[in-house]
């Protein structure tokens, strides 16, 4: 006996399907489901009187290698590669397959390797959005409490540097020296996120740089507060080329050792990741933003300037003074701070993100940025551009899928590619670590419902633990079993340079996390930034700070109101 369901009925039971549209949070962004990998009439649904029971959707006697440890049923996947509905299968902490799960003995179209058996746990994904765990590549490790804020926001990988609230760490994302790298790998072993450390890259000779990589750094960071001279840039990049690691750079705001063109010349066509590319967070004033037009530069933003609002300029001065050890009573320190803050370039940054010319988003945690707002600020920027610029020219249909895919790539796949993490994290595809985030559409971009680390729930919206059911207030983002005990180490990764594994010292640190070498960091270019590979010809007027891309003036008004803001965080 067959029965026909209208779209509303179907979505209520099984979640949205091909052609259905829904809004992301309270933004102006609307997605449309592009395809559905499940099978109509044979959908997997768990619960009393439902499908995933023995002999029905659950198979008996299947080979263990084909049985899933976890199935997320009927989830709406939002990834750089597409927006589609699927069952998501997890085995041994990794994504096993995307498609149709269930019992092939009685169900049509079950994807190979997606059998539901007696060893399978289930998460009901009907009506939920699933994304890859976010990656924040600009972490100042000022306090360990950042990890809780990050994972609660949907970020599962932290890459950066520091040793705690030291003056150097407050200003620069560097973990300097082999001893500090070793201690910080041991300290961050207790954090329920993947971690990679950046060593100090400021040296005009290579010896001290390579030593940090052998000790376990996953890359190097050049920062102006340590002296980002052309000689230091060249030496750091030479070491990176020899060791297949990424270099991140914060250039010389004061233009003491050279201007933007001098740093670009020092890059010499070699791959480099430019932090806070607009410049309010630091960099050649006023035209570091020019690097968005360089094919070897992988540009990112930090979230204090995301998006441009009526409050952005005012809040930056105090942040700069604190983070960079400045004295506001000294005219030269005040001039240094004020030289960075330019409404014209911040406005242009919004537009460059929308064009796909700035490829990544990050936080600058506790050093002008907010670690728990990478995801939120990304979608606020997307919303602002949707309202101010309309649909992207390449959209096909009455939706914002291209823009949504472009913006999700900025904090998932692109930072993974840039820093050599993409074999493990950054996208929802088979073989990747099951770092997955589930969202209720109304709360998308603000409050994840569940955060999985390596296939185990590590953080979740959870009610009163003394209640009779999980939902009574106060419902808060709380740590779950995946963030505890030895499960933490079994579901997280410590990223290191390949030289560290070859040297062998890092294996003696006693880490519980799996050690993974970064790879594929060199020879990258803007062309490798998914959906964010635009290479406009950039011009910056040194007097007015006006920014042009391919001759077009980049301008937008500051926002007075944003989505995903106070209404989501009253409690």
From Swiss-Prot:
Its EC number is 3.5.1.5. CDD domains: Urease_alpha. Residues 133-571 form the Urease domain. It comes from the Bacteria. Ni(2+) 1 binds at residues 138, 140, 221, 364. GO terms for molecular function: nickel cation binding; urease activity. It is found in: Cytoplasm. It catalyses: urea + 2 H2O + H(+) = hydrogencarbonate + 2 NH4(+). Binds 2 nickel ions per subunit. Ni(2+) 2 binds at residues 221, 250, 276. InterPro entries: Amidohydro-rel, Metal-dep_hydrolase_composite, Metal_Hydrolase, Urease_alpha_N_dom, Urease_alpha_subunit, Urease_AS, Urease_asu, Urease_asu_c. Gene3D superfamilies: Metal-dependent hydrolases, Urease, subunit C, domain 1. The modification N6-carboxylysine is found at residue 221. Pathway: Nitrogen metabolism; urea degradation; CO(2) and NH(3) from urea (urease route): step 1/1. One of its GO terms (biological process) is urea catabolic process. The keyword Membrane does not apply. The active site is at 324 (proton donor). Substrate binds at residue 223. It holds the Pfam family Amidohydro_1. Keywords: Cytoplasm, Hydrolase, Metal-binding, Nickel. GO terms for cellular component: cytoplasm. Its cofactor is Ni cation. Heterotrimer of UreA (gamma), UreB (beta) and UreC (alpha) subunits. Three heterotrimers associate to form the active enzyme. Belongs to the metallo-dependent hydrolases superfamily. Urease alpha subunit family. This is Urease subunit alpha.
């Amino acid at each position: 006996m067959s029965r026909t369901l209208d779209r509303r009925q179907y979505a209520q039971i099984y979640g949205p399907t091909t052609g259905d549209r829904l809004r992301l949070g309270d933004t102006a962004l609307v997605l449309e489901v592009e395809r559905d990998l499940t099978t109509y009439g044979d959908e997997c649904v768990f619960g009393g009187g439902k499908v995933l029971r023995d002999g029905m959707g659950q198979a008996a006697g299947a080979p263990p290698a084909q049985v899933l440890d976890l199935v997320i049923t009927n989830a709406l996947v939002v990834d750089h590669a597409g927006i589609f509905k699927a069952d998501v299968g997890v085995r041994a902490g990794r994504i096993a397959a995307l498609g149709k799960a269930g019992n092939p003995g009685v169900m049509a179209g079950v994807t190979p390797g997606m059998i539901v058996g007696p060893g399978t746990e289930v998460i009901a994904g009907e009506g939920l959005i699933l994304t890859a765990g976010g990656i924040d590549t600009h972490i100042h490790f000022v306090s360990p409490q950042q990890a809780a804020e990050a994972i609660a926001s949907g970020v599962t990988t932290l890459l950066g540097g520091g040793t705690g609230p030291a003056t150097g760490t407050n200003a620069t994302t560097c973990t300097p020296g082999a001893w500090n790298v070793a201690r910080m790998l041991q300290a961050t072993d207790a954090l329920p996120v993947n971690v990679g450390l950046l060593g100090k890259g400021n040296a005009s000779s290579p010896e001290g740089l390579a030593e940090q990589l052998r000790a376990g750094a996953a890359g190097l960071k050049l920062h102006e507060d340590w002296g980002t001279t052309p000689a230091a840039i060249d030496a750091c990049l030479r070491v990176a080329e020899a060791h297949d690691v990424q270099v991140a750079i914060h250039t010389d705001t004061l233009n003491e050792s050279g201007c933007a063109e001098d740093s670009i010349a020092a890059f010499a066509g070699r791959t480099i990741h430019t932090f806070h590319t607009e410049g309010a967070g630091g960099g050649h004033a006023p035209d570091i933003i020019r690097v968005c037009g360089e094919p070897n530069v992988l540009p990112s933003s930090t979230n204090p300037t995301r998006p441009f609002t009526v409050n952005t300029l005012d809040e930056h001065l105090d942040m700069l003074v604190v983070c960079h050890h400045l004295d506001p009573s000294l005219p030269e320190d005040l001039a240094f701070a004020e030289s960075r803050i330019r409404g014209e370039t911040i406005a242009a940054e919004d537009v460059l993100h929308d064009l796909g010319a700035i490829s990544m988003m990050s936080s600058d945690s506790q050093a002008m940025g907010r670690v728990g707002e990478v995801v939120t600020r990304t979608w606020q920027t997307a919303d602002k551009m949707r309202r101010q610029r309309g649909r992207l020219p390449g959209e096909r249909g009455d939706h914002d899928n291209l823009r949504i895919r472009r913006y999700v790539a900025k904090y998932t796949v692109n930072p993974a590619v840039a820093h050599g993490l993409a074999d493990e994290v950054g996208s929802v595809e088979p073989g990747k670590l099951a770092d997955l985030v589930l969202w209720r559409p109304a709360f998308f971009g603000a409050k994840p419902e569940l955060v999985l680390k390596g296939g185990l729930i590590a953080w979740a919206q959870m009610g009163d633990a003394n209640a009779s059911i999980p939902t009574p207030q106060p419902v808060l983002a709380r740590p779950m079993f995946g963030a505890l005990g030895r499960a933490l180490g079994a579901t997280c990764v410590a990223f290191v340079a390949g030289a560290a594994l070859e040297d062998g010292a890092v294996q003696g640190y006693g880490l519980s996390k799996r050690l993974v070498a970064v790879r594929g960091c060199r020879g990258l270019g803007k062309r490798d930034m998914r959906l964010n590979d635009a290479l406009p010809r950039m011009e910056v007027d040194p007097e007015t700070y006006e920014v042009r891309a391919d001759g077009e003036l980049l301008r937008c008004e500051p926002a007075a109101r944003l989505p995903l803001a106070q209404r989501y965080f009253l409690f």
